[in-house]
Structures are given as C-alpha cells and as structure tokens.
C-alpha cells in the first residue's frame, strides 16, 4: 500500500471520528433543549390547573374501605372533590362508589364538606353505586343530588358497630397474665385483655346510638 493510500485512509478515519463527535454533541444539545422545552411547558401549564380545556363531567372513583389510612380517606378524597368543584369547566360531578363503609368520622367529614361545596355552586353531583354502597359508603353517596344503583347493588346498611377482641380466656389457658397500669376510668375500655364492664358497655352503646342518630338525621335532611 502506498503512502498516499495510507494517508487517505487515516484522513478518512479522522473525518469519521470528527463526524461522530459532532453527532454526539448535537444529540446532547438537542436533548438539553428538549428538557428545557418540557420544563417550560410544565411551568406554563401546571398539572394542578384545569387539565381539560372544554366543559366536562368529573368522575371521582371511591373504591374500598373508608379509613384514615384506607383507599377512601378525607385527605385524598376531598382534594379530588375540591378540584372538581373549583374547576369552572367541570359542569357535573359523579361519585363512583364501591365501598362497604368504614370509619364513621371519615365518612361524616366527607359528607359535610360536599354539602358545604354544593352551597357555593350550581354544579350537579350524582352518586353511582356499583357493587356496594353500604354504611359509610352510603353516607357519602347521600351527599349527592341523586343516587343511582343497579338492582343487584347492595345499598343501605345504616348502622354503627364498635368491634373489640377479647383474648383474656385464651391467655388464661396459656398461663399468660396481662399487667397494665392506667389512670382514668375509661382508659381500658377496649383493652383486649380485660372484660368489658357493664358501665363500659352502656357507654359504648350510647356512643353508637348517638352516631347512628346523627347518621339518620343527615340522611333525612
């Protein structure tokens, strides 16, 4: 191979390397520009703003047990509901409910907040019960203007229950003794290692009846 041929090959390789470096540089510049564009768009159109650019109906799915740490809770549920009420393009709200109930407190807070929001708007809000809308699930559903349910849906179950397990007899059989130091007559009211006293039973029954009566009163209003 002549020196000229070798020189041409070397020059060709050098040019290829330069082209590769230019391509990599351009790719990086393009990538940075793309990121800047995305960042700018996210600032000018934040996700918390009106996502929909035309009139629409918001569908809020409430599925599961109602509890402070459950899938239906005051924090996440009311955040979605408030966004729908505050969105001028949202004309109707549908609560898609599939819940056996849960916390009376969480249900009551959601129910009350929806009633407050309804006073300041002319939006229509409907509850659609799928498989189950019982107890607290029905409580929340009752905040709507209308409730829709299938003939096979489980709806209602207006009531209150307070549950507690008692391991005292089991521990006695195992020779295990529970020792607790407490102050206040009701501090051990639901202690799983103590029997409920008649006074405690009366107190809990009155509490359940009070919550139940409030539940019924809200549903009648």
Model region roles, listed by residue range:
Residues 1-124, 132-221:
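Small-residue-centered hinge/linker elements
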